[in-house]
Every structure is written in C-alpha cells, then in structure tokens.
C-alpha cells in the first residue's frame, strides 16, 4: 500500500513537473520568436529608426543570453534586460508613422512586444521551483519507507547475491524518480537537459544576418557602450 501510494504521488508530481518544464521551454521559444519578428517588422520604418530598433533588440537578446540566463539559475532577473526593454519602448514613441504601412507596422510591433513580454514573464516565473517543501518531504519519506519495506520483507536465509540487486533496484528507482522531479522543477539549471538560451542565440544570429553591417550600441554581453 505504501509503495503504491508513493508511486501514484511520484507519477503525479512528475506530470506536474513536466508541464512546468514544457511551459518554460515554450516561453523561451515564444520570446525569441517575438524578438525576431520585431526585428523583421523594423524594416518597414526609415533606415535610421530601423537600425536603432534592431540594435536595441540585439542588445536585449545578448543581455538575455549572457546576463539573465545565469541570473535565473539564482532565481533572479537582469536589470540590464529591463534597460534594453525601456530603450526600445522609448523608440516606439519616436517612430515615424505617417503612412498607413508605418501605422500598421507600429501596431504589429506593439503586439509582438506584448508577446515578448508574456514569454519573458513566464520564463522568469518558471525559474522558481514550484514543488513546495512539504511535498518534497512527503516524496523523500515515501521513498525511504518503500525501500525500508522492501528490506523488511526479505528472507534472511536468502543469499545476499540475490537480495542485494533486488533492494538496490528498488532504491535506484526511488532515487531516479526523485532526480527526475528535481530536474523538471529546475528547468533552467545548467544540468544535462536544462533549457538553454538556444532559441535566443538563433534569433541573434538571424537578426545580425538581416543587416551584417549593423553595429549595436552594446558589448557581446549586452552592456551599453
């Protein structure tokens, strides 16, 4: 009964953790896609404004990759990212919107900016573990009891070469389950399988290829220059 209850609880927590992990990956991809689409939409504005907007977006992406991603592993965001958000938003108010095309482009930029904001906000929300301490304690306690019960029902007359692998197998399954829960509940950590800023890196490459001669006003880590 205890083993069954533990297995059901573990399966439920893994399912919830997988939903968090999937949401975190989707949020990072949505944010990166919105940044790329904003950079493409910038082509509908005069050259100087186009280049400034693309430069701000490149700096935003660099700050996300080099500053905010490591900060998320400590449960924080990056003020540098906020700085570049403020920069491109200020530019929105100065964009030329004399033609119908430019008016439509501004509306598209605002919509994409909202999508980017939602993606980033979900990304920052998902970097905080969602499994509460009492649930972790219940999982650890249940796993320990399951292993202890396995030990208590063995026949001492059996050879250790038979009992050892059986007990080790149960303990291994319990430990593996707990590790999977931890992995899914910490989606942005640097462990194998952790979500990396690969989507934003790809966006940066694509945006820079749109205008190879563009020189953004920031360092490779997104710091203003």
Predicted region positions:
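Transmembrane signal-anchor/signal-peptide helices with a preference for the extracytoplasmic
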Residues: 5-29, 185
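Structured inter-helical modules in multipass membrane proteins
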Residues: 23-25, 30, 36-128
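Solvent-exposed, non-transmembrane helices and loops of integral membrane proteins
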Residues: 39-61, 65, 189-225
């Amino acid at each position: 009964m205890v083993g069954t209850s533990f297995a059901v609880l573990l399966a439920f927590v893994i399912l919830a953790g997988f939903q968090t992990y999937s949401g975190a990956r989707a949020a990072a991809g949505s944010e990166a896609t919105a940044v790329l689409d904003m950079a493409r939409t910038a082509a509908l504005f005069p050259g100087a404004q186009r280049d400034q907007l693309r430069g701000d977006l490149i700096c935003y992406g660099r700050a996300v990759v080099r500053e905010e991603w490591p900060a998320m592993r400590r449960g924080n965001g990056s003020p540098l990212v906020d700085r570049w958000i403020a920069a491109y938003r200020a530019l929105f108010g100065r964009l030329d919107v004399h033609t119908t095309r430019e008016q439509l482009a501004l509306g598209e930029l605002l919509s994409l900016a909202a999508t980017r904001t939602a993606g980033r906000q979900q990304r920052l929300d998902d970097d905080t573990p969602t499994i509460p301490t009492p649930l972790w304690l219940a999982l650890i306690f249940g796993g320990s009891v399951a292993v202890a019960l396995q030990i208590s029902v063995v026949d001492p007359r059996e050879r250790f070469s038979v009992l050892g692998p059986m007990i080790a197998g149960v303990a291994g399954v319990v430990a593996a389950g707990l590790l999977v829960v931890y992995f899914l509940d910490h989606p942005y950590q640097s462990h194998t399988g952790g979500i990396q800023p690969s989507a934003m890196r790809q966006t940066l490459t694509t945006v820079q290829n749109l205008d190879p001669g563009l020189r953004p006003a920031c360092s490779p880590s997104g710091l203003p220059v």
